[in-house]
Amino acid sequence: MSSLLRATLITLALLTTAGCTSKPVLNTQHELPATSLVSEEKMKQVIVAALQKREWTVQRLSPQRVQAEITVRGQFYAAIDIRYTRNSYAITYRDSRDLGYKDGKIHRNYNRWVSMLDRDILAGLRTYSVNQANTSPQN
């Protein structure tokens, strides 16, 4: 195999691999079952606790909305909105830097950060629901 052909194949392989790091932006939305309803204040507390656990910084708290941001390794920045009610919440992309956002696609690490945050919020809500069920008076 000629060295020119080999170099071309290696370049194509590297470009293909580099293109795989960009994925569609992950926006999550969850409706809680009727048995798991919480107060808006409790929903906000669970969301803020999950943000703190994952080292996101809360920028602004307002009724039914939390704005947060994260900077990783002093370079990679992402900002999100979390809208919530007593029975639902949604995490949506707001802004980013150095994560290659373009045409609704972004570096896969952003999606990983949002996915882990989402998992922690759900876990916090589950824990709260279990604790509430255990402390409710039995008939």
Go through each PLM region and give its residues:
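C-terminal motif of bacterial Sec signal peptides marking the signal peptidase cleavage site
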Residues: 16-19
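Hydrophobic alpha-helical targeting segments used for export or membrane insertion
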Residues: 9-14
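Bacterial N-terminal signal peptides that target proteins for export
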Residues: 1-8
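Ser/Thr-rich, low-complexity intrinsically disordered terminal regions
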Residues: 21-139
